Protein backbone atom coordinates (compact mmCIF):
# COMPACT_ATOMS: atom_id res chain seq x y z
CA UNK A 1 0.00 0.00 0.00
CA UNK A 2 2.82 2.39 0.83
CA UNK A 3 4.49 2.10 -2.57
CA UNK A 4 1.42 3.14 -4.67
CA UNK A 5 0.85 6.10 -2.35
CA UNK A 6 4.49 7.17 -2.71
CA UNK A 7 4.26 6.95 -6.50
CA UNK A 8 1.10 9.08 -6.52
CA UNK A 9 2.80 11.59 -4.22
CA UNK A 10 5.82 11.79 -6.53
CA UNK A 11 3.62 12.46 -9.56
CA UNK A 12 1.65 15.17 -7.73
CA UNK A 13 4.77 16.91 -6.42
CA UNK A 14 6.67 16.73 -9.72
CA UNK A 15 3.76 18.11 -11.73
CA UNK A 16 3.01 20.78 -9.12
CA UNK A 17 6.53 22.22 -9.07
CA UNK A 18 6.76 22.16 -12.88
CA UNK A 19 3.41 23.98 -13.08
CA UNK A 20 4.65 26.57 -10.60
CA UNK A 21 7.84 27.04 -12.62
CA UNK A 22 5.81 27.56 -15.79
CA UNK A 23 3.60 30.14 -14.08
CA UNK A 24 6.60 32.02 -12.66
CA UNK A 25 8.26 32.14 -16.07
CA UNK A 26 5.11 33.26 -17.89
CA UNK A 27 4.30 36.03 -15.41
CA UNK A 28 7.88 37.24 -15.47
CA UNK A 29 7.97 37.08 -19.28
CA UNK A 30 4.96 39.39 -19.55
CA UNK A 31 6.59 41.88 -17.17
CA UNK A 32 9.90 41.65 -19.04
CA UNK A 33 8.21 42.24 -22.40
CA UNK A 34 6.71 45.45 -21.08
CA UNK A 35 9.88 46.65 -19.34
CA UNK A 36 12.40 45.86 -22.10
CA UNK A 37 11.64 48.90 -24.31
CA UNK A 38 10.99 51.22 -21.37
CA UNK A 39 14.04 50.77 -19.14
CA UNK A 40 17.55 52.05 -19.93
CA UNK A 41 19.94 49.21 -20.75
CA UNK A 42 21.86 49.23 -17.46
CA UNK A 43 18.72 49.54 -15.33
CA UNK A 44 16.92 46.90 -17.36
CA UNK A 45 19.82 44.47 -17.07
CA UNK A 46 19.99 44.86 -13.29
CA UNK A 47 16.21 44.58 -12.92
CA UNK A 48 16.09 41.57 -15.22
CA UNK A 49 18.77 39.65 -13.38
CA UNK A 50 17.35 40.47 -9.98
CA UNK A 51 13.89 39.40 -11.13
CA UNK A 52 15.22 36.10 -12.44
CA UNK A 53 16.99 35.48 -9.14
CA UNK A 54 13.80 36.20 -7.19
CA UNK A 55 11.56 34.10 -9.42
CA UNK A 56 13.82 31.07 -9.48
CA UNK A 57 14.38 31.43 -5.74
CA UNK A 58 10.63 30.99 -5.32
CA UNK A 59 10.88 27.84 -7.45
CA UNK A 60 13.79 26.45 -5.41
CA UNK A 61 11.85 27.20 -2.23
CA UNK A 62 8.97 25.11 -3.58
CA UNK A 63 11.34 22.22 -4.29
CA UNK A 64 12.47 22.26 -0.68
CA UNK A 65 9.09 22.85 0.96
CA UNK A 66 7.40 20.03 -0.98
CA UNK A 67 10.18 17.64 -0.08
CA UNK A 68 11.07 17.13 -3.75
CA UNK A 69 14.70 18.19 -3.32
CA UNK A 70 17.30 18.34 -0.60
CA UNK A 71 19.22 21.35 -1.85
CA UNK A 72 22.64 22.59 -0.79
CA UNK A 73 23.62 25.62 -2.87
CA UNK A 74 25.34 27.56 -0.10
CA UNK A 75 28.85 27.22 -1.57
CA UNK A 76 27.94 29.70 -4.32
CA UNK A 77 27.16 32.38 -1.74
CA UNK A 78 30.87 32.92 -1.06
CA UNK A 79 31.21 34.38 -4.59
CA UNK A 80 28.48 36.96 -4.14
CA UNK A 81 30.58 39.99 -3.19
CA UNK A 82 33.77 38.93 -4.95
CA UNK A 83 35.49 40.24 -8.09
CA UNK A 84 34.36 39.29 -11.61
CA UNK A 85 34.67 35.56 -12.25
CA UNK A 86 33.50 32.89 -14.66
CA UNK A 87 31.53 30.21 -12.82
CA UNK A 88 32.05 26.90 -14.62
CA UNK A 89 29.84 24.02 -13.44
CA UNK A 90 29.25 20.56 -14.86
CA UNK A 91 25.73 20.15 -16.23
CA UNK A 92 23.85 16.99 -15.18
CA UNK A 93 20.30 18.42 -15.17
CA UNK A 94 17.99 20.79 -17.04
CA UNK A 95 17.47 22.97 -13.94
CA UNK A 96 21.14 23.51 -13.06
CA UNK A 97 21.18 27.10 -14.31
CA UNK A 98 17.86 27.89 -12.63
CA UNK A 99 19.16 26.81 -9.24
CA UNK A 100 22.54 28.54 -9.56
CA UNK A 101 20.87 31.80 -10.61
CA UNK A 102 19.00 31.90 -7.28
CA UNK A 103 22.21 32.70 -5.39
CA UNK A 104 23.46 35.92 -6.96
CA UNK A 105 21.69 39.09 -8.20
CA UNK A 106 24.16 39.87 -10.99
CA UNK A 107 24.92 36.77 -13.03
CA UNK A 108 25.14 36.88 -16.80
CA UNK A 109 24.36 33.53 -18.39
CA UNK A 110 25.54 32.06 -21.68
CA UNK A 111 22.63 30.06 -23.07
CA UNK A 112 21.48 28.28 -26.21
CA UNK A 113 20.14 30.71 -28.78
CA UNK A 114 16.81 28.90 -29.22
CA UNK A 115 15.98 29.59 -25.57
CA UNK A 116 16.04 33.32 -26.31
CA UNK A 117 12.86 32.77 -28.37
CA UNK A 118 11.24 30.42 -25.87
CA UNK A 119 7.87 31.67 -24.61
CA UNK A 120 8.81 30.84 -21.01
CA UNK A 121 12.40 32.10 -20.96
CA UNK A 122 13.00 34.41 -23.91
CA UNK A 123 11.68 37.77 -22.73
CA UNK A 124 13.30 37.55 -19.31
CA UNK A 125 16.60 36.44 -20.82
CA UNK A 126 16.63 39.37 -23.22
CA UNK A 127 15.86 41.86 -20.44
CA UNK A 128 18.70 40.41 -18.35
CA UNK A 129 20.99 40.65 -21.41
CA UNK A 130 21.89 36.98 -21.29
CA UNK A 131 24.26 35.90 -24.03
CA UNK A 132 23.25 33.50 -26.84
CA UNK A 133 25.86 30.96 -27.85
CA UNK A 134 24.99 30.43 -31.53
CA UNK A 135 27.60 32.90 -32.86
CA UNK A 136 30.86 32.09 -31.04
CA UNK A 137 32.72 35.31 -31.90
CA UNK A 138 29.86 37.54 -30.81
CA UNK A 139 29.29 35.40 -27.73
CA UNK A 140 32.93 35.79 -26.68
CA UNK A 141 32.83 39.54 -27.34
CA UNK A 142 29.62 40.02 -25.32
CA UNK A 143 30.84 37.83 -22.46
CA UNK A 144 34.13 39.73 -22.18
CA UNK A 145 32.27 43.06 -22.19
CA UNK A 146 29.90 41.89 -19.47
CA UNK A 147 32.71 40.65 -17.23
CA UNK A 148 34.50 43.98 -17.56
CA UNK A 149 31.42 45.63 -16.08
CA UNK A 150 31.70 43.44 -12.96
CA UNK A 151 29.63 40.54 -11.73
CA UNK A 152 29.75 36.90 -12.65
CA UNK A 153 29.38 34.90 -15.85
CA UNK A 154 27.69 31.49 -15.71
CA UNK A 155 29.04 29.29 -18.48
CA UNK A 156 28.71 25.51 -18.70
CA UNK A 157 31.96 24.36 -20.35
CA UNK A 158 30.27 21.26 -21.81
CA UNK A 159 27.83 23.39 -23.78
CA UNK A 160 24.98 20.94 -23.11
CA UNK A 161 23.84 18.54 -20.42
CA UNK A 162 26.25 15.77 -19.48
CA UNK A 163 25.77 12.62 -21.54
CA UNK A 164 28.72 10.51 -20.43
CA UNK A 165 30.58 9.79 -17.23
CA UNK A 166 32.10 11.87 -15.78
CA UNK A 167 31.80 14.82 -18.21
CA UNK A 168 31.46 15.67 -21.90
CA UNK A 169 34.23 17.25 -23.94
CA UNK A 170 34.72 20.88 -22.95
CA UNK A 171 34.37 23.89 -25.26
CA UNK A 172 37.43 26.13 -25.56
CA UNK A 173 35.32 29.30 -25.52
CA UNK A 174 35.53 29.44 -21.72
CA UNK A 175 39.32 29.67 -21.89
CA UNK A 176 39.22 32.31 -24.62
CA UNK A 177 36.76 34.45 -22.64
CA UNK A 178 38.78 34.14 -19.44
CA UNK A 179 41.98 35.10 -21.26
CA UNK A 180 40.55 38.15 -23.02
CA UNK A 181 38.60 39.38 -19.98
CA UNK A 182 41.55 38.59 -17.68
CA UNK A 183 39.30 36.98 -15.07
CA UNK A 184 39.63 33.71 -13.13
CA UNK A 185 37.55 30.60 -13.72
CA UNK A 186 35.87 29.08 -10.68
CA UNK A 187 35.00 25.40 -11.07
CA UNK A 188 31.69 24.36 -9.50
CA UNK A 189 30.83 20.70 -8.98
CA UNK A 190 27.17 19.68 -9.13
CA UNK A 191 26.33 16.36 -7.50
CA UNK A 192 22.90 14.76 -7.72
CA UNK A 193 21.67 11.26 -6.98
CA UNK A 194 18.80 11.17 -9.51
CA UNK A 195 18.81 11.46 -13.31
CA UNK A 196 15.71 13.68 -13.23
CA UNK A 197 15.74 16.07 -16.21
CA UNK A 198 19.07 14.81 -17.47
CA UNK A 199 19.66 14.58 -21.22
CA UNK A 200 16.98 12.24 -22.56
CA UNK A 201 14.66 12.41 -19.53
CA UNK A 202 11.04 13.14 -20.62
CA UNK A 203 9.80 16.33 -18.99
CA UNK A 204 6.75 14.75 -17.36
CA UNK A 205 8.35 11.50 -16.27
CA UNK A 206 8.05 10.76 -12.56
CA UNK A 207 11.28 11.03 -10.54
CA UNK A 208 12.00 9.12 -7.36
CA UNK A 209 11.83 11.64 -4.51
CA UNK A 210 13.46 13.19 -2.61
CA UNK A 211 16.38 14.17 -4.83
CA UNK A 212 19.67 15.21 -3.26
CA UNK A 213 21.32 18.10 -5.11
CA UNK A 214 24.52 19.76 -3.98
CA UNK A 215 26.89 22.35 -5.43
CA UNK A 216 30.44 22.65 -4.12
CA UNK A 217 33.38 24.69 -5.34
CA UNK A 218 36.46 23.19 -6.91
CA UNK A 219 39.67 24.83 -8.03
CA UNK A 220 39.85 28.47 -9.03
CA UNK A 221 42.05 28.96 -12.11
CA UNK A 222 43.92 32.18 -12.75
CA UNK A 223 43.28 33.90 -16.10
CA UNK A 224 44.92 31.58 -18.63
CA UNK A 225 47.91 32.51 -20.72
CA UNK A 226 47.68 29.43 -22.94
CA UNK A 227 44.12 28.36 -23.71
CA UNK A 228 45.01 24.81 -24.80
CA UNK A 229 46.94 24.10 -21.60
CA UNK A 230 44.15 25.62 -19.55
CA UNK A 231 41.51 23.43 -21.19
CA UNK A 232 43.56 20.32 -20.45
CA UNK A 233 43.90 21.31 -16.79
CA UNK A 234 40.21 22.21 -16.57
CA UNK A 235 39.11 18.83 -17.87
CA UNK A 236 41.47 17.06 -15.46
CA UNK A 237 40.00 19.07 -12.58
CA UNK A 238 36.46 18.04 -13.48
CA UNK A 239 37.44 14.40 -13.86
CA UNK A 240 39.17 14.33 -10.48
CA UNK A 241 36.38 16.19 -8.68
CA UNK A 242 33.62 14.05 -10.21
CA UNK A 243 35.26 10.72 -9.46
CA UNK A 244 32.74 8.74 -7.44
CA UNK A 245 30.03 11.41 -7.76
CA UNK A 246 26.45 10.14 -7.23
CA UNK A 247 25.52 10.69 -10.89
CA UNK A 248 28.22 8.26 -12.04
CA UNK A 249 25.73 5.44 -11.47
CA UNK A 250 23.42 6.60 -14.24
CA UNK A 251 25.91 8.42 -16.49
CA UNK A 252 28.04 5.32 -17.04
CA UNK A 253 25.60 3.79 -19.54
CA UNK A 254 25.60 5.05 -23.13
CA UNK A 255 22.02 3.79 -23.65
CA UNK A 256 20.09 6.55 -21.92
CA UNK A 257 16.61 5.10 -22.26
CA UNK A 258 17.59 1.64 -21.03
CA UNK A 259 19.60 3.06 -18.16
CA UNK A 260 16.81 5.45 -17.12
CA UNK A 261 14.25 2.63 -17.13
CA UNK A 262 16.54 0.45 -15.04
CA UNK A 263 17.30 3.27 -12.63
CA UNK A 264 13.65 4.20 -12.16
CA UNK A 265 12.67 0.59 -11.52
CA UNK A 266 15.46 -0.04 -9.01
CA UNK A 267 14.81 3.28 -7.25
CA UNK A 268 11.09 2.57 -6.98
CA UNK A 269 11.74 -0.86 -5.56
CA UNK A 270 14.21 0.53 -3.03
CA UNK A 271 11.88 3.32 -1.93
CA UNK A 272 8.98 0.92 -1.60
CA UNK A 273 10.76 -1.39 0.81
Task: List where the protein language model places each region.
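Catalytic core of membrane glycerolipid acyltransferases/transacylases, capturing the structured
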Residues: 31-54, 66, 81-135
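Thr-Gly-centered strand-to-loop micro-motif
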Residues: 74, 111-112, 134, 157, ...
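Glycine-rich helix-loop-beta junction characteristic of Rossmann-like nucleotide cofactor-binding loops
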Residues: 75-80
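Non-catalytic C-terminal accessory region of glycerolipid acyltransferases
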Residues: 4-8, 137-273
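Short gly/ser/thr-rich secondary-structure transition/capping motifs
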Residues: 66-74, 133-137, 197-200
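A transmembrane-helix-recognition feature enriched in membrane-embedded lipid enzymes
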Residues: 3-72, 123-124
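Short glycine/serine/threonine/alanine-rich loop segments
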Residues: 69, 130, 183
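A generic structural signal for well-ordered alpha-helical segments
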Residues: 63-64, 125, 146, 178
